[in-house]
């Protein structure tokens, strides 16, 4: 599955680097320069942790615990989704994997169990929960350096263009307050855009 895909990609990258050096398209120093960058290793470690979280089902268990604790109403379910994203945000460096691979299937399952399906009564709960999930995913993607794959590129650009260095903790300190405000207000804000909410 995903392990084979990662192995194939890694092999392709290494073969590409080797061919680039052999054909003098780049020097060996240029080919290996990225391996000495701490941001690169931070992202590699985060992807390894993410693989473990997804493969072991830990992400799903975290989300279900949040739902168990907060999900007494549909708005509570919205907060459970936000809490799950907040916990998983710094650990899973792909917001697509986090949102689409962990959170979305759980949200879809909860929506269907409440009798809310895409073709049948989506406004009961599914519409609201999917909106919360999608927006919470984007908020947590911006909160942490490892929140999404593009953030390390932004960090590197800030260093190269402006001379400003964003490490993981600096990024988190800058993003935590606006992120928490966004996650706290999101379920209530989106509640007013939903036509009707049921209580469970």
Please identify what each model-predicted range represents.
Residues 8-11, 150:
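Catalytic-loop motifs flanking and including active-site residues across diverse enzymes
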Residues 95-99, 114-198:
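Juxtamembrane and boundary regions of transmembrane helices in multi-pass small-molecule transporters
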Residues 1-6, 199-200:
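Short, small-residue-biased leader/transition segments that mark boundaries at the very start
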Residues 7, 68, 72-75, 124-127, ...:
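Membrane-water interface of alpha-helical transmembrane segments
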Residues 2-3, 17-23, 45-50, 82-89, ...:
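Hydrophobic core segments of alpha-helical transmembrane domains in multi-pass membrane transport
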Residues 6, 33, 173:
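Phosphate-coordinating loops and pocket residues in cytosolic domains that bind phosphorylated ligands
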Residues 10-118:
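Membrane-embedded alpha-helical segments and adjacent helix-loop junctions characteristic
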């Amino acid at each position: 599955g995903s392990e084979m895909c990662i192995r194939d990609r890694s092999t392709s990258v290494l073969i590409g680097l080797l061919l680039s050096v052999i054909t003098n398209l780049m020097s060996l120093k240029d080919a290996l320069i990225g391996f000495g960058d701490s941001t690169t290793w931070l992202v590699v470690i985060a992807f390894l942790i993410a693989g473990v979280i997804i493969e072991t089902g830990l992400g799903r268990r975290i989300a279900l615990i949040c739902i168990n604790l907060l999900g007494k109403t549909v708005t509570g379910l919205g907060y459970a989704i936000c809490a799950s994203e907040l916990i998983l945000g710094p650990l899973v460096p792909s917001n697509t994997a986090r949102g689409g691979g962990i959170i979305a299937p759980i949200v879809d399952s909860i929506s269907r169990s409440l009798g809310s399906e895409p073709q049948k009564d989506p406004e009961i709960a599914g519409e609201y929960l999917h909106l919360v999930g999608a927006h919470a995913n984007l908020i947590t993607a911006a909160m942490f350096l490892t929140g999404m794959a593009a953030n390390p590129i932004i960090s590197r650009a800030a260093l190269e263009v402006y001379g400003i260095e964003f490490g993981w903790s600096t990024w988190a300190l800058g993003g935590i307050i606006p992120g928490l405000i966004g996650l706290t207000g999101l379920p209530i804000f989106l509640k007013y855009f939903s036509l009707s909410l049921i209580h469970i």
